[in-house]
Regions:
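N-terminal leader/targeting peptides and immediately adjacent processing regions
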Residues: 1-43
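Structural secondary-structure packing elements that flank or coincide with functional cores
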Residues: 2-19, 122-161
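A contiguous, mid-protein "functional segment" used to position or interact
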Residues: 31-36, 44-46, 58, 110-141
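Long, amphipathic alpha-helical coiled-coil segments characteristic
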Residues: 29-72
Length: 163
């Protein structure tokens, strides 16, 4: 077999010229963002309290009139908490709210058959976690409660899927 000569052509890399030398993150911008978050920290308590009150109001409306609109409002309130509670330094509220979202969103009937007692248990757990100011994600009692709620939701969803 004869050897064939190969020429390798390396085109010039002009990406660096186009992008520039940039040093990555602007540490001053990061410090300003951290300072802004710290300034808002005092307001976090008010915001999460308002969000939990909205959840409780939506839950009461659903208990009074269990229709899909009220269930949708309950879901949206739980979804807001799921997304914001960790920022507000209440990761267990986020965890329980996530479980509530799962129950009201993933059921085959859109959550209509979710047991009222399980809905109430989620809302009550969120209110207690906030009232007791449980911010530690490893709090023994709250993690046991969150785990049990998640387990009950899994059981509910399995039953719903089997129908």
């Amino acid at each position: 077999m004869s050897k064939q000569q190969v020429e390798i052509f390396m085109p010039p890399n002009k990406l660096k010229q186009k992008v520039g030398e940039g040093g990555g993150l602007d540490l001053n911008a990061v410090k300003r963002a951290e300072a802004a978050i710290e300034d808002l920290r005092d307001e976090f308590s008010d915001w999460i309290t308002a969000d939990v009150e909205n959840l409780a109001t939506a839950h009461e409306a659903y208990k009074t009139d269990p229709n899909m609109d009220n269930l949708g409002t309950l879901y949206r309130c739980a979804h807001d908490l799921k997304g914001q509670a960790t920022t507000f330094e209440f990761p267990l509220v986020a965890r329980v709210a996530s479980s509530l979202c799962k129950m009201t969103d993933e059921g085959g009937d859109g959550g209509k058959s979710a047991p009222a007692s399980l809905l109430s248990a989620h809302v009550d757990a969120i209110k207690v976690i906030l009232r007791q100011k449980i911010m530690d994600p490893s709090d023994k009692m709250a993690t046991v409660l969150a785990s049990e709620l998640e387990r009950q939701v899994t059981v509910f969803l399995q039953k719903t899927a089997a129908r």
